[in-house]
Amino acid sequence: GASFHHNLLAHHTNRCPRLNGARYGWGGSSADNYASSIEAEQVDLRNNVMYNWGKGNGAYAGMGGYHNIVNNYYKYGPATKNKDRVFQCGHTSGASGEVIPKNTYGHFYIDGNYVRDKGENYDWKGVIIDDGNTTVRDTIKLKEPVNPGVVTTHSAQKTFEKVLAYAGASYKRDAVDARY
């Protein structure tokens, strides 16, 4: 799996995190079928600050994979159209070339996210399903998070403070920087 944490994503319309889900000859959704990272994506999207995400949403897609969306801070900006959208859950369309079955959704653990003017734990209120099929909402929710590996987890509010304090290029130069 992969962990994407403590990042500042700002002023993007088409570059918000896209969770790819399952790929490469996917064999179906079962407990035995996800032993290989080639079979299913496992992603931990945690402690990020999303700002001014344009016409889309904080992240999207995720077909067939297992994902955490935890303690992120969403602050809309002047170009943000959907001001309360945490995630847009995709599903496969069955188009030619897709390797996973039609109408395959991902599985998501969504918890502790903050959306400006909506407050703490906005979470599933900020999720839309691509095809509007709200009947799948309970089947795609994970009760427990995917193992994120070793990562320090902060509240969404603390994430906002820490990411703004440390994101971007620093002026401090160490010995490696000084050689250039």
Residue ranges of predicted features:
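Right-handed parallel beta-helix
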Residues: G1-L19, R23-G54, Y66-P78, Y109-R116
